[in-house]
């Protein structure tokens, strides 16, 4: 029996999204023992319980109030939402924030020798998918009638098996499609992982814990998207150098011993620093340029 006074978070039991979730919580300073393959894991340093379940169970657990929070792909969340609405339900939850991992897209894919001219050419075609409601919503907007073939796995084999003319499946790199003689022809939904919270009143102590967790998550994501930059630069070209680093806060400027014409610059940049940018910095007279990762960050 779960202790309802503790914050309950549902996340995927295994897979890439699970690994990303565990890394996020770890970087937030939450210590969880995941050595044993238990369905429930307990945080050692915070009143938090982790429910490790199938990804398609997570939206329902949040919407039904079984857990307080869930980390889930937007594609799975949207499919469950549309499914419940189709059954006349009014599912309640709210999204706390989109996360910076779990990126994928739900796409239509056809055989390499199939001519695709747009959604209209799918009229009355058989389409295999694990996301029938998202697919229907998309094709309804296009005015296309189709025959759905529901598969819960191995969707990419449907055309070769004669089950469908086209498939609608998740795509990350496209390697699986290529291996099965398919090509991506239309993206219908783009997804990332997100953090959702159940609807309804939350006890004050739980809400305070959620607020603390959100602050830490924001800090982790911001740190991953930022770099700490140090360099030596000519004093007369500081404005030009700062212009090359959009998203950077105003830098810290320190004098260099024995050289009044140059300074040391330290700054946090929220932009990716490409080699081209570093070459431009060097052309402006910057030297000893260091770009360092940031582990934690709090504004």
From Swiss-Prot:
Record's subcellular location: Cytoplasm
Known function: Catalyzes the condensation of ATP and 5-phosphoribose 1-diphosphate to form N'-(5'-phosphoribosyl)-ATP (PR-ATP). Has a crucial role in the pathway because the rate of histidine biosynthesis seems to be controlled primarily by regulation of HisG enzymatic activity.
Short name of one Pfam family: HisG
Name listed for the protein in its UniProt record: ATP phosphoribosyltransferase
GO cellular component, one term: cytoplasm
Organism: Yersinia enterocolitica serotype O:8 / biotype 1B (strain NCTC 13174 / 8081)
Family to which this protein belongs: Belongs to the ATP phosphoribosyltransferase family. Long subfamily.
Catalysis performed (reactions): 1-(5-phospho-beta-D-ribosyl)-ATP + diphosphate = 5-phospho-alpha-D-ribose 1-diphosphate + ATP
Primary location group: cytoplasm
GO MF: ATP binding; ATP phosphoribosyltransferase activity; magnesium ion binding
Subunit structure and binding partners: Equilibrium between an active dimeric form, an inactive hexameric form and higher aggregates. Interconversion between the various forms is largely reversible and is influenced by the natural substrates and inhibitors of the enzyme.
